[in-house]
Amino acid sequence: MKRIYTFGHEQVERNITVGDIIQNKNNNKKMTQVTAANQEEAEIIAKENIDMIITGSDWYEDVRKGAPNTFITAALFAGRFITNEEILRGAFEVMMAGADSVLTPRSFDVVEMLAKEGMQVQGHVGMVPSMATKYGGIRTVGKTADEAITILKDMKRLEDAGAFGAEVECVAEDALIEIKKHTSLVINSLGSGSGGDVMFLFFEDICGETSGIKMPRHAKSWGDGNKIKIELNNERSNAIKGFKDDVESGDYPNSDHTVDMLPGEKEALLEKLDNF
């Protein structure tokens, strides 16, 4: 564990620091990062010694409870913070609360604004989900030389803006391996293959709990959480049905679930009610 001061000047211990992350990159030591949306997920991630957690800034405090010493990046969701003032305030609030870095998918000017305040900032390049329509839908980008060079240009602009790292999403693996040689950014690879410095996946994909969307091609499940969820929800459904059936039949509530008045008090109540 490393002793550090947070952005809010609180002395804490962390499993890894930005300095360590950069050193690991330079030494070609792979790192891991997983999303967490709540305390329970964070506890599991921390227990298994994952290097870094990324979460939404609104969920940060709950996630931190589950992983008090893990390096946590707080993502500033684009729709949550609109103006520069809102972005800056949101970033300050979560960094003061103890986040180790912030990630923003916004402009290079926004990255620069945050970095100038002394925050550790990460950008987002590649197939940024909100930009999927620009690429003709959800797909891997960087499959042509021109696209790969555009991604590298974005990385260089992030460097110039003061970012230390970037989430690189759905970029062709061989393209990233080559363009990575030309950037100092710490590369968090989400669906971009082995060229990243940090291998990054979503908690629900890893645990087999993806629902409502098609499982991403780059994702892999090492568990079957959905099977357990189905069993749990079947048990819940049976319990709800049992409650309804027992109410309708008069079996609930019974004497096991109720309390009567003290001896003689019911008679006293009836007498009082007669005179009410």
Q: What would you call each of these model-derived segments?
A:
Residues 1-276:
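Alpha/beta enzyme core
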